């Protein structure tokens, strides 16, 4: 019996996940608002707006009809930007069958409320099972079928295991966990740290400074994870340390690239807004609320707010009181 995976979102990540599902032998449906994108995927097996140089796997059915896409789906992957998740699923969520688990594929914390994506969706669709997919993965790698490993989290262990089995494929390996908030915390906060790493390289501080920022940033991530009741193994795993390593070291990362441009003094007005920009002030406030020492996250928030320069941020970090390493 064939299985159906529905993907909501025709961007790079949504397209890649639809390609992954098709390569796994599933009935793969993709919802996109843009009619030209839908035609191109169905006719030419390409998404001209995203990943235009990649020929997509056979079997993807793209449509502008969200109801047709989600009907009978064994899983619905919500690939909607974090700050648009509430509006997106408020509009589309009523179409999703209650039996279909919703897998959140955006990494971020909602502005104004400070809620994780699962908390946002639980408000909108309280009767649905909610999961999250996160880990070190670039859309272009997944779309090309390059080896990738991620984590699928759901507070219901059986659902987490079923989703991991469903979404795993020839080159896409999923690990399961019930630590939903831990997975989401790592995925959201690494975006902020990636901006710091990119800014250090863009400013010319070198690889040593980059390594120091990532390592000490991970210490902050661990402290925040502990305050959020995340399991240590989750923060040390693919959705925490793994995603941090990838995002803080490659220009394929939108957040790292944003930091690079920031460090180089480039005009940022025409660049796509990186999710870490929205998350930074929320993360800083979260740390203050829980009395967590997070000087790097605080510095990124102040930098993006125009309160300090990169040089001032680095000087302040280097001149903090000496302490034992934690």
Swiss-Prot record:
Catalysis: reaction(s):
sn-glycerol 3-phosphate + NAD(+) = dihydroxyacetone phosphate + NADH + H(+); sn-glycerol 3-phosphate + NADP(+) = dihydroxyacetone phosphate + NADPH + H(+)
Q: Does the keyword Aminoacyl-tRNA synthetase apply?
A: no
What's the domain of life for this entry? Bacteria
Its keywords, alphabetically, are: Cytoplasm, Lipid biosynthesis, Lipid metabolism, NAD, NADP, Nucleotide-binding, Oxidoreductase, Phospholipid biosynthesis, Phospholipid metabolism
Q: Per the UniProt entry, what are the Gene Ontology biological process annotations, in alphabetical order?
A: carbohydrate metabolic process; glycerol-3-phosphate biosynthetic process; glycerol-3-phosphate catabolic process; glycerophospholipid metabolic process; phospholipid biosynthetic process
Any one Gene Ontology MF annotation carried by this entry is: NAD binding
Identify the residues that bind NADPH. 13, 33, 107, 139, 254, 273, 275
Enzymatic class: oxidoreductase
Binding positions (sn-glycerol 3-phosphate): 107, 135, 137, 190, 243, 253-255
The biological pathway it contributes to is: Membrane lipid metabolism; glycerophospholipid metabolism
One GO CC term, this protein: cytosol
Where is it chiefly localized? cytoplasm
Q: Where in the cell is it found?
A: Cytoplasm
- Pfam families recorded: NAD_Gly3P_dh_C, NAD_Gly3P_dh_N
Q: Give a yes or no for keyword Lipid metabolism in this entry.
A: yes
Location of the active site: 190 (proton acceptor)
InterPro entries per UniProt: 6-PGluconate_DH-like_C_sf (IPR008927), 6PGD_dom2 (IPR013328), G3P_DH_NAD-dep (IPR006168), G3P_DH_NAD-dep_C (IPR006109), G3P_DH_NAD-dep_N (IPR011128), NAD(P)-bd_dom_sf (IPR036291)
Supply the EC number(s).
Answer: 1.1.1.94
Please describe what this protein does.
Catalyzes the reduction of the glycolytic intermediate dihydroxyacetone phosphate (DHAP) to sn-glycerol 3-phosphate (G3P), the key precursor for phospholipid synthesis.
Name the family.
Belongs to the NAD-dependent glycerol-3-phosphate dehydrogenase family.
PANTHER family in alphabetical order: GLYCEROL-3-PHOSPHATE DEHYDROGENASE (PTHR11728), GLYCEROL-3-PHOSPHATE DEHYDROGENASE [NAD(+)] 2, CHLOROPLASTIC (PTHR11728:SF1)
The entry's protein name is Glycerol-3-phosphate dehydrogenase [NAD(P)+]
> Source species, please?
Brucella canis (strain ATCC 23365 / NCTC 10854 / RM-666)
């Amino acid at each position: 019996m064939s299985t159906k995976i529905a993907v909501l979102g025709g961007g790079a990540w949504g397209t890649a996940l639809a390609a992954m599902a098709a390569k796994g032998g599933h009935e793969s449906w993709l919802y996109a608002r843009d009619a030209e994108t839908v035609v191109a995927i169905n006719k030419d097996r390409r998404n001209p707006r995203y990943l235009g140089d990649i020929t997509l796997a056979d079997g993807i059915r793209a449509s502008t009809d969200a109801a047709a896409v989600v009907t009978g789906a064994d899983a619905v992957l919500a690939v909607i930007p974090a700050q648009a998740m509430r509006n997106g699923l408020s509009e589309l969520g009523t179409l999703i069958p209650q039996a279909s688990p919703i897998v959140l594929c955006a990494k971020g914390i909602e502005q104004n409320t400070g809620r994780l994506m699962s908390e946002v969706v639980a408000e909108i669709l309280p009767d649905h099972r909610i999961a999250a997919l996160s880990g070190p993965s670039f859309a272009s790698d997944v779309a090309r079928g390059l080896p990738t490993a991620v984590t699928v989290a759901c507070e219901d262990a059986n659902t987490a295991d079923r989703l991991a089995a469903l979404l795993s494929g020839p080159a896409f390996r999923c690990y399961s966990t019930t630590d939903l908030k831990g997975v989401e915390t790592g995925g959201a906060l690494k975006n902020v740290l990636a901006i710091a790493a990119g800014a250090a390289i863009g400013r010319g501080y070198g690889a040593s400074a980059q390594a120091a920022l990532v390592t000490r940033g991970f210490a902050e991530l661990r402290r925040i994870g502990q305050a959020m009741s995340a399991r240590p193994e989750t923060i040390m795993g693919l959705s925490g340390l793994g995603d941090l390593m990838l995002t803080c070291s490659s220009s394929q990362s939108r957040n790292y690239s944003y930091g690079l441009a920031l460090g180089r003094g480039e005009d940022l007005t025409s660049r796509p807004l990186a999710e870490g920009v929205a998350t930074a002030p929320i993360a800083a406030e979260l740390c203050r609320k829980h009395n967590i020492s997070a000087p790097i996250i605080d510095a990124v928030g102040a930098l993006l707010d125009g309160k300090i320069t990169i040089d001032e941020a680095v000087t302040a970090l280097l001149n903090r009181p000496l302490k034992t390493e934690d």
